[in-house]
Amino acid sequence: MSILSFLLGEKKKSASVAKERLQIILAHERTGHSAPADYLPALQRELVAVISKYVKIGDQDLRVSLERQDNLEVLEVKIEIPQN
């Protein structure tokens, strides 16, 4: 971030904010201190809101799931994007 951006109060892009939130959630999950997948509904709503700014999708067009096997966690996001 440049000094000009800081002084003028330029806002971050919503995609970078969403990316930062995902990184925080994943880092928090790796420490093992959070409840299992309590954040998934909120994450799904936020992702729909961000993606809807660029592509017309509904709540049912995006699915978020978290799978755990041994020491591996997979956060899967499926998005159905209309062809038009």
UniProtKB/Swiss-Prot annotation:
Supply the Pfam families for this chain. Answer: MinE (PF03776)
Q: Would you kindly state one Gene Ontology biological process term found in this protein's UniProt entry?
A: regulation of division septum assembly
Q: Kindly give the Gene3D superfamilies that the UniProt entry links to this protein.
A: Cell division topological specificity factor MinE
Per UniProt, the keywords (alphabetical) are:
Cell cycle, Cell division
For whether the record's keyword set contains Cell cycle, the answer is: yes
Give the NCBIfam families listed for this entry.
minE (TIGR01215), PRK00296.1 (NF001422), PRK13989.1 (NF010595)
The entry's function note states:
Prevents the cell division inhibition by proteins MinC and MinD at internal division sites while permitting inhibition at polar sites. This ensures cell division at the proper site by restricting the formation of a division septum at the midpoint of the long axis of the cell.
Q: Identify its protein family.
A: Belongs to the MinE family.
Name of this protein? Cell division topological specificity factor
